[in-house]
Structure formats: structure tokens, C-alpha cells
Amino acid sequence: MADFFDTLSDKHIAMCAKQPVFFVATAAEDARINLSPKGYDAFRVLAPNKVAYLDLGGSGNETHAHLAADTHESGGRITLMFCNFEQPALILRIYGRGRPVLPQDAGWTELAGHFTLLPGTRQIFVIDVESVQTSCGWGVPFMAYEAERPTLKKAHAQADPEQWEAKMKDRTSSIDGLPARATDRYIAGTPLD
């Protein structure tokens, strides 16, 4: 049975912090639904009703395009899902409205201070939480976490900044043609071990 909450509780926040992966879903009105897994230490709770996550440059920019396409003052619709792959069984969904904040945007410096910036950081998504849902998660399998995949961080760390910036400028539309803004700079982030 599902339970709904207006904000994130301390128990919810602790559950999210333990998960090595979470999932992000967005949908613009006339576009395909996008669903993406997210890893690394990229999720932060800014307040019980506000969360954010760090986004690295990747193969597309669907989330940005979907959130920007919505004219709602708080941004586009977004859902984040966390699954506990250990005990106790639990699924937690965060429903809200989100917006991208890029390095060239007002508020970037303060927001970025909540994260350890990784090589290739492209933007931070800020989500105003509208509701939180928990459900049993009994159908979610047990899975053991091994390690982060280092490939994306290594590729960004070894990138030529000018080539990386040019590549990100190519990520200015979704697969359905919705526009997305590009970051204006390469962020080297914290050196890798």
C-alpha cells in the first residue's frame, strides 16, 4: 500500500542517501517520456521540500529539454525514484517541478556549493517537491552494490575542454526537437583518484 507525504522526512532522506542509484523521469506534453538512471554522489536534499541533483554531460539532454518546455513557473514535471535493494523493502518517489541551473546562471555558485563537482559537470537540476510517495517494494530484487563505473568521469577528466564544450553545444535539443540550453564552460571538477 502506498503512503503519501507533503515533504521528505528524516527517514526518507536517510533512505535516499543510502542508494547508489536513483531514477529520473520527465515528460513534455508532446514528447516521448524520458527515464534515466543516475549514479555517483549526485543527489542532495536542500530542504524537506526541495532537492537537487548534479548532471554530467552525456549522450543527450532530454531532462533539461522536458523541464524547459513546460511554462509552469516552477518548471516541468519530474519524478525521482529510489529503490532499496537491501532490507527493508521500500520504493520512494519524489514528485515535483524541476528546472535546470547551468554554470552561467544566477544562483549557480551557491547551488554548486552543495556538491563535489565532478569532471564534466553540465548542470544541476533543482526540484520543488510537491509530494513524496512510499510503497512496499516487495517486487524489487535484492542486489549487491559493487562499485561506481569510472568510465564517464574518466572520459570527462581526460577531455579537451574546447572539444567538450563543442560537444555540449550539440546537445541543445531533445530527440523530439525540444530546445535545451548548453553549458558555457567545461568544469574540471575534483581530480579523480
Please describe what each predicted stretch is:
Residues M1-D193:
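Binding-site signature for planar aromatic cofactors or substrates
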